[in-house]
Amino acid sequence: MMIPERPSLERRVLAAFDGSSGGDARIPVLLGGCGTGRTSVLLRLRDLIGHSAAQYIDVERVATTPERFLASIRAASPFTGHHHDELGDGAPGARAAFDASLAYLDTARAPGNGPATFLLDEFLELRTFESFPGLRTVLRDLIEVLTSAGNRFVLTTRYSARTHRLLRDAAPRFEIIPVAPLTAAEIRATLPAGAARTVSGSIDDEDDRGREDLAPLVGLIADGRPSYARMITEASATMGPRGASDPVSALSSLLGPGGTISTACRFCYELRLHRARGYGALKAILDVLADEEGLTLTEIALRLRRTPGSTKDYLSWLEDVDLIVSRHKRYSFADPMLRLWVRLHCQVTPPSEEDIAREVHAYVLARLPHSEPALAMAGVAEAAPERDKPWGIIEID
């Protein structure tokens, strides 16, 4: 599955930082949870802008010490003409190195002396530097420099609540853009020719019709998240009869111990919990919400046997790292796939194949439009199907 093209999102980002949509040029800040495709959007933008005019920086990977960060972004720079002496070459100390990094972001120029474009992936990870002497306001300093810089920037992060808090008093130049789920059309465009082949019919016709059927189902199961969609699509192409795709069985396989979706969910779960406070209590709340979503603070407190005051603190810490969301004072998982993973894997023993099949069955039915599972369970069809679909949602048991 190729990097998905997201035309509407890409146009919005490009229009924001070049000012073509009216008004002053802005700095897009892309917000999205695990697997929503923030990185793939930045890599697509680099291709569209040109590798000589844009630098992608994976902040999460290179934010070690300020000195090494500066050396890393300089070494990978596609730009010419920035003066190393002005950027603090040989200057001792973390503060000097960080100031030199900010100066580089401000003064580097693209070929022809045009503005350089910096694509900063997981920019909040620069907060790592705040443990060094003299660097207590790293993110505020970054925002101040970017606001007045003559270059162009696109920022991403997986932490929505923290970003809103950081930018609350920032200049209006920053434009927050949530990364929307992939549409069925965007998923369909990434499917390889043989990935959606159905059981009968000519190869070309069936490939086209198969992709039309497969893309919406993959989108529903994956919650529109590119990483889940890619894993489901790649696995399903190898599991169906005679090459036919079976995304439901693929999801069951991927959620087993060692499966790629299981591994991705475990990473997201542990990463976010370790960035929050109250590790054990927060895990307990996630267990409660995995059993039943849409609970109020009082209902969660009763299940935890904790006071409403302490439970409110725990919930705020989970919201701070975007593991849960609150709608009308009722709490749910931000990522439905992560909830499914918690139901399966946060237990005394690893899940059996029967456990996985049962939970995946319930998960898929809950995400389908209400009419489809009802008709399927009743054995009713409005019209005779033109062809058999390879996924047997009701027959997983």
Task: Report each predicted region and the residues it spans.
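Short amphipathic alpha-helical interaction segments
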Residues: 305-320
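Conserved NTP-binding/hydrolysis module of P-loop NTPases
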Residues: 54, 64-88
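Conserved small helical "lid"/interfacial subdomain of P-loop NTPases
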Residues: 179-213, 221-224, 232
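A short hydrophobic beta-strand->loop->alpha-helix junction that borders the nucleotide-binding pocket
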Residues: 31, 55-64
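Conserved Walker B catalytic segment
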Residues: 96-161, 165-169
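Short, amphipathic alpha-helical interaction segments positioned at domain boundaries
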Residues: 338-367
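Walker A/P-loop nucleotide-binding motif
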Residues: 24-43
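Winged-helix-like regulatory helical subdomains adjacent to P-loop NTPase cores
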Residues: 230-306, 355-360
